[in-house]
UniProtKB/Swiss-Prot annotation:
<dbReference type="GO" id="GO:0000049">
    <property type="term" value="F:tRNA binding"/>
</dbReference>
<dbReference type="GO" id="GO:0106026">
    <property type="term" value="F:Gly-tRNA(Ala) deacylase activity"/>
</dbReference>
<dbReference type="InterPro" id="IPR023509">
    <property type="entry name" value="DTD-like_sf"/>
</dbReference>
<dbReference type="GO" id="GO:0005737">
    <property type="term" value="C:cytoplasm"/>
</dbReference>
<dbReference type="GO" id="GO:0019478">
    <property type="term" value="P:D-amino acid catabolic process"/>
</dbReference>
<dbReference type="Pfam" id="PF02580">
    <property type="entry name" value="Tyr_Deacylase"/>
</dbReference>
<keyword id="KW-0963">Cytoplasm</keyword>
<dbReference type="InterPro" id="IPR003732">
    <property type="entry name" value="Daa-tRNA_deacyls_DTD"/>
</dbReference>
<dbReference type="GO" id="GO:0043908">
    <property type="term" value="F:Ser(Gly)-tRNA(Ala) hydrolase activity"/>
</dbReference>
<comment type="similarity">
    <text>Belongs to the DTD family.</text>
</comment>
<keyword id="KW-0378">Hydrolase</keyword>
<comment type="subunit">
    <text>Homodimer.</text>
</comment>
<feature type="short sequence motif" description="Gly-cisPro motif, important for rejection of L-amino acids">
    <location>
        <begin position="137"/>
        <end position="138"/>
    </location>
</feature>
<protein>
    <recommendedName>
        <fullName>D-aminoacyl-tRNA deacylase</fullName>
        <ecNumber>3.1.1.96</ecNumber>
    </recommendedName>
</protein>
<dbReference type="GO" id="GO:0051500">
    <property type="term" value="F:D-tyrosyl-tRNA(Tyr) deacylase activity"/>
</dbReference>
<keyword id="KW-0820">tRNA-binding</keyword>
<keyword id="KW-0694">RNA-binding</keyword>
Amino acid sequence: MRAVVQRVKRASVAVDGNAVGEIDKGLCILLGVANDDTEEDANYLCEKIVNLRIFEDETSKFNLSLKDIDGEVLVVSNFTVMGDARKGRRPNFMFAADKEKAERLYNYFVERLKGLAKKVECGIFQAHMEVEIVNDGPVTILLDSKKVF
């Protein structure tokens, strides 16, 4: 399971021009599910994300986590995060999970996160979405449950 985690001042997601999720200060997560992922991968990423110290304290050091600041989360499913572009010019998505597995683990991830964060909003799985992000920093962290980077 792979996540692109962005620290935001605010973020929103819309489908067909209608807002389906929006947050204030917190994290926007683009989440991709791999074909060999399990609930353990989701658990690992959820814990890692809410405890990741990427918010500044009063001395401007990265010392505070999402939990510390009582921040909000926007989760957007994004299979392209699993793309492999090492060879050729077109990304290969052979490592992305099939629709059923990806949706099940995405929903599990969101529900697990709801137990760990103040507010969790999300997009609509497999929909074409418009995501608006006001980055804070910018601070962008790449996480992979298999720790490939």
